[in-house]
Amino acid sequence: MSTSQETQPHWSLKQSFAERVESSTHPLTSYLFRLMEVKQSNLCLSADVEHARDLLALADKVGPSIVVLKTHYDLITGWDYHPHTGTGAKLAALARKHGFLIFEDRKFVDIGSTVQKQYTAGTARIVEWAHITNADIHAGEAMVSAMAQAAQKWRERIPYEVKTSVSVGTPVADQFADEEAEDQVEELRKVVTRETSTTTKDTDGRKSSIVSITTVTQTYEPADSPRLVKTISEDDEMVFPGIEEAPLDRGLLILAQMSSKGCLMDGKYTWECVKAARKNKGFVMGYVAQQNLNGITKEALAPSYEDGESTTEEEAQADNFIHMTPGCKLPPPGEEAPQGDGLGQQYNTPDNLVNIKGTDIAIVGRGIITAADPPAEAERYRRKAWKAYQDRRERLA
């Protein structure tokens, strides 16, 4: 898709990742830019393996070379859903150890109330272990706003651990932190509250009853309290040097374009993605796309599309979204680059994706996973993708 950006590149294409930190509107985007500079890596591994043990082993081996690990939890056999010791928790420990962010490629698409539950509840509780997720916005921009609300609510509650205790007494409603906590306690109260009567006789010979009420209460304690027991071993709690741990904020990538042959995501859809991103900068980090969309206009994407809205030049120029692009594949030394996998996936080299098309992070899957030496191949991709980024800056300087 040709755009005016080819002759007038957006400022974000010229700046270093370190320089773009200053203009970032999302804490996680700022962190990722700094992490990329520290590791000199703009590589994401698409870890599409079939078993949890293979996923964890691959993340541990390739972690030093990447800044993002992309997962599909629902295709993993043996995924342990335990919130503290399960697969998600172990991935989070590896992310801290090696310095990368976890991107769950969930592609949410549904009404707002449904995606909120899919994101923060259910068996996987994606929000708790994945820094980043993504969405297909065919369901509308309101879905993005709903996910942002769910992430914010989770973020506000995360500094505290909920402690449940059983005591004898009368419950007081204002002891509960919020409406949700009160609802949870009410459910517990139904289970454990018992009215027990024992028959005795008073001194005058009359029967009397002694009534005992057992009450469940909840208190909140800071998550860093020394009284809380660690659920991951100390060896797994190593932290990558050179940068602090990632912020607890959560981020969304909007699926704006795909590389599969015959993809139905046309220019009108991509333009709606751009509008949704600009309206939700506090939650949207950027895009999964095939080109750089910073500063893009409706005329460049869908000139005949009448949406009744307009974007000012100032709004377009303020864009500083991060871009990730899949389908990256390097040929063996001395061979030409492959064009695809025969299943609709179209491949691109790091230079084409990062230097020419302007993406920030190259996503690589089978090129690393199926290699004889995945860590060594990951390093080869890291070097090539980083050089493509340096070449882009030099070319546009």
Curated annotation (Swiss-Prot):
Q: What is its EC number?
A: 4.1.1.23
Q: Which SUPFAM superfamilies match?
A: Ribulose-phoshate binding barrel
- Residues that coordinate or bind substrate: 48, 70-72, 105-114, 347, 366
Q: Which catalysed reactions does the entry list for this protein?
A: orotidine 5'-phosphate + H(+) = UMP + CO2
Instruction: Please provide the Gene Ontology terms (biological process) for this protein.
Output: 'de novo' pyrimidine nucleobase biosynthetic process; 'de novo' UMP biosynthetic process
Determine if Acyltransferase is one of this entry's keywords: no
Pathway this chain belongs to = Pyrimidine metabolism; UMP biosynthesis via de novo pathway; UMP from orotate: step 2/2
Alphabetically sorted, this entry's keywords are:
Decarboxylase, Lyase, Pyrimidine biosynthesis
Write one Gene Ontology MF term.
Answer: orotidine-5'-phosphate decarboxylase activity
Active-site residue numbers? K107 (proton donor)
Protein family per UniProt: Belongs to the OMP decarboxylase family.
Matching PANTHER family, A to Z?
A: OROTIDINE 5'-PHOSPHATE DECARBOXYLASE (PTHR32119:SF2)
Q: What is this protein called?
A: Orotidine 5'-phosphate decarboxylase
